[in-house]
Each structure stands twice: as structure tokens, then as C-alpha cells.
A protein has these predicted regions:
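An exposed tryptophan-centered "aromatic clamp" motif
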Residues: 111-147, 239-240
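Alpha-helix capping/hinge segments and adjacent helical runs
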Residues: 130-173, 179, 185-187, 191
């Protein structure tokens, strides 16, 4: 079935963008590693779907608020309708590529946002095409959707991009359950080429040995060494021998806590350093 749809899409030129943080503190662990994401030419809706647009697609009138109520089942029905009518949405699509309609991936969303192609709404929560992950290990570097690896209830969740309620320039990655109807969500669509070939992903394993050695060094520098140096400089050298256990424990604790806020920047993963998944 082909529908006479009038949805507006804007072209986002191919390019690259960096996603994530390279700050070393533990509070940034879920946002690491910083990595390069390359995007092809794709089309994105400048605005999220409105109630009128959604009513037109589904061919029945929605009540107030229903355009912000989503579940996986409802989303799949909508995408099926739109993919069947993809030629109507963008008549001059490149026929040499296979295209799909779906929510944007995080890389596509960031690229469109950087290029000022999209309009955001204060306090909104936009559905993304990516699965929920604890960090960016295994993230797709060619901007294809990230699928869920593993078991558990998080497989029913989807990643979302949440906009600050007062500052339009602040946004953060969050998630929403899609196994049931969920209020407060918005949907923006992309028409993007299906990625061919094996995906390129952020390596799943970090250099654990190096991270442990670095942590021991910084715990010593910020915690253990000052813990022993301070009583020595204050003329309390005897306490170093009698209370060494307390000094060591205190130094370990303080050095450990400093890691929550500061550690040296972590390496950035570039596209050419990505892991090709067979």
C-alpha cells in the first residue's frame, strides 16, 4: 500500500563525528570510549512526528498525547507502513542503494544536530534505533543500529536522546522500555541506506592490564605518597612507623576516590582502529 504522505525530510551530508567522552574519571565510564562515527548521506526529519502526521500515516485520528505514546509493536507497525511507501517520502532516492525508514542511530542524531539540521524540543525524549548498552564498547562506528547482545530485561529497552528541560543545547543518552506502552516519547525518522558488509565497531575489550597499572600509579601519586609525606614533613616521622597501616589505608582510600573525578584522558578510537565484526 502506498500512501500520499507529506512528511518533510532534510539531507544530511556524509561525514564523521566523534561520540562519547575521553575524560578518565569513573563518573564518565558509561560515556567511554570516545570514538569516531562515519555517516553516509541520509535524510532526517527536522522535527519529530506530530499528532497530525501520525494520524495521516495510521489513517485514523489520534487523541491528544497519543503521538508521545510508543511501544515496540506500535513502532514496528508504523515503520512497516513507511517502508512500503518509501518511494513517496523521497522520490529521487539513489536506486543503487537499499534504503530503510527507522529512528536515527546515536551517530546519525549527533551528526544531524551538529549540522543544525534538526529542531529539538525542551524536555523531550527521542527514540533512537540503538539497543541499550552500559558503555560504548561494541558501538557501531559506521552508524548502523546497535543490536542488543546478551540476555535480560534490557533487551526490551531502546536508547533515547533526552533534551534538558531548560537548556536546549544539553542532551544526554537515556533509555525507555518498549515492551509496553510508554508515555513521554517522541519519534523522529530517518531514511538511511542499509549498511552493506561486516560492521565496524569499537573494540569490545579495553587494555585491562594497562588500566590497572595506571590506576595503581595514580592512587600512589594522589593517595599513598602524600599520606606518608605529610606526617614526615610535619615532624611526625615516628608515626610513619607506628601508624603505617592507617596511613596506607587512608592513602589508598583517598587515591581511589580521586579516580571518580579525574584521571588522564583515555585514547580516542578512530574509525580505522575499529574492529571488523565477521
Amino acid at each position: 500500500m502506498t500512501l500520499p504522505l507529506n512528511l518533510k525530510f532534510a539531507l544530511v551530508k556524509e561525514g564523521a563525528i566523534f561520540v562519547g567522552e575521553d575524560k578518565g574519571g569513573w563518573i564518565y565510564a558509561s560515556q567511554r570510549p570516545k570514538h569516531e562515527v562515519r555517516t553516509p548521506n541520509f535524510y532526517i526529519m527536522p522535527n519529530v512526528l506530530s499528532r497530525n502526521e501520525l494520524s495521516e500515516i495510521l489513517d485514523f485520528e489520534l487523541s491528544d498525547g497519543e503521538d508521545h505514546r510508543w511501544s515496540r509493536e506500535r513502532l514496528n507497525v508504523l515503520l512497516q507502513i513507511l517502508n512500503d511507501s518509501i518511494g513517496v517520502l523521497i522520490p529521487d532516492l539513489d536506486d543503487s542503494k537499499k534504503w530503510e525508514v527507522r529512528p536515527p542511530t546515536q551517530g546519525e542524531w549527533h551528526k544531524a544536530n551538529r549540522d543544525a539540521t534538526i529542531n529539538k524540543t525542551l524536555g523531550s525524549k527521542e527514540i533512537l534505533a540503538d539497543a541499550v548498552t552500559p558503555n560504548f564498547r561494541g558501538a557501531m562506528m559506521d552508524s548502523r543500529p546497535k543490536t542488543f547482545d546478551g540476555f535480560g530485561p534490557m533487551k526490551w529497552h531502546t536508547a533515547t536522546m533526552e533534551i534538558h528541560p531548560k537548556n536546549i543545547n544539553i542532551h544526554a543518552l537515556s533509555s525507555a522500555p518498549m515492551d509496553r506502552e510508554n508515555d513521554g516519547l517522541s519519534l523522529r525518522l530517518v531514511i538511511s541506506p542499509v549498511r552493506d558488509g561486516p560492521p565496524v565497531a569499537v573494540p569490545k575489550q579495553a587494555n585491562l592490564r594497562r588500566n590497572i597499572l595506571d590506576e595503581l600509579v595514580w592512587i600512589s601519586v594522589f593517595g599513598i605518597i602524600p599520606s606518608f609525606a605529610i606526617p614526615w614533613l610535619r615532624g611526625m616521622g615516628d608515626y610513619i612507623y607506628s601508624g603505617w597501616a592507617n596511613l596506607l589505608f587512608g592513602g589508598l582510600c583517598f587515591g581511589f576516590v580521586t579516580g571518580a573525578f579525574w584521571r588522564p584522558k583515555r585514547p580516542t578510537i578512530y574509525f580505522d582502529d575499529g574492529e571488523v565484526l565477521e
